[in-house]
Amino acid sequence: MESSTQTKPGSLIVVGTGIESIGQMTLQALSYIEAASKVFYCVIDPATEAFILTKNKNCVDLYQYYDNGKSRMDTYTQMAELMLKEVRNGLDVVGVFYGHPGVFVNPSHRALAIARSEGYQARMLPGVSAEDCLFADLCIDPSNPGCLTYEASDFLIRERPVNVHSHLILFQVGCVGIADFNFSGFDNSKFTILVDRLEQEYGPDHTVVHYIAAMMPHQDPVTDKFTIGQLREPEIAKRVGGVSTFYIPPKARKDINTDIIRLLEFLPAGKVPDKHTQIYPPNQWEPDVPTLPPYGQNEQAAITRLEAHAPPEEYQPLATSKAMTDVMTKLALDPKALAEYKADHRAFAQSVPDLTPQERAALELGDSWAIRCAMKNMPSSLLEAASQSVEEASMNGFPWVIVTGIVGVIGSVVSSA
């Protein structure tokens, strides 16, 4: 469906629908669902299922392969094989899974690996995962101060390490030690083993957030705050189900290494770094975080400078034609058009009417920087840098590209393989 180098008929594209019904499905995922020869889906809400069925009439619901007491791994093997069978029959297959199709999803990875090993085109497209929803709903940044993510049973079985100075996210906390499936939910009888481990690492008084992402647009997420010790209470423990996730905030901030700060030259000469990294805004779930004020001296000065702001010389405002906007949109959302373009950049670019000469040259080349130059009002200083970068790339074995002249946005671009 996408590559001109494919020699065997049949392909597999795996996409995600996000967690919240319909609205978190990407435009890219939707375009592949619409273009597929056959769609296999496993989603958790009927509105998303109904929406998928309006976009492609040749669909199979994979959820029917779950059963009470049946091994989930057996189900996953069957799901993968159902998709692979149609790929081997020469169809362009799309597998649709809720959330991100590669995050806590086994059959997608299995099917892709086997398809690739057999010589078929296979690709996974990103989607909105439950973890993405958690970051948004709890307003935490995984980069500050770092984040560990584990599956709860694996966390216990393999004694995965904990860094009490970073975020910890545990998935599938409502089915600890359970390998089969039950339509009525899981008997989470081994849950206290997980609580024991968390108490060992953090103590009974540390915060844990019981999180469930909203699955319908009219719902709010569950963000219940408890102590780890409270998880032993039956009334609280029974709230934890198959779609529950735990977020455990850092226990304390780690001291910075002042020697490394100096080596990296992060601070002006003579300035002494604080013992702790101060932040704003603070993490509402984290205790005792050294926090900066929202409007300190530096912030107030930066806001004052807005009054005299003028775009810098190297700022790049958009300056593109409707034809270029339309064709780039088509390449993003039409898998068949994308396949045609990848097969022959030059022929495809020549078939598009109303492009400027610069836009057509950039489209023929297919280089992201050249396309950016054509669509933006690119300053000459950046164009010269682009020219130098292209020249260096050609020396390293990339296709030979010569920027022969700079006229307007970009000059004529000559490319030969």
Curated annotation (Swiss-Prot):
UniProt xrefs under InterPro entries: 4pyrrol_Mease (IPR000878), 4pyrrol_Methylase_sf (IPR035996), 4pyrrole_Mease_sub1 (IPR014777)
Chain intervals for the UniProt region annotation (Precursor leader): 379-399
UniProt keyword list: Methylation, Methyltransferase, S-adenosyl-L-methionine, Transferase, Virulence
Modified residues (N-methylthreonine): 404
Domain of life: Eukaryota
Positions carrying N-methylisoleucine: 406, 410
Gene Ontology terms: biological process: methylation
Gene3D superfamilies: Cobalt-precorrin-4 Transmethylase, Domain 1 (3.40.1010.10)
Protein name: Methyltransferase/ribosomally synthesized cyclic peptide dendrothelin A precursor dbihMA
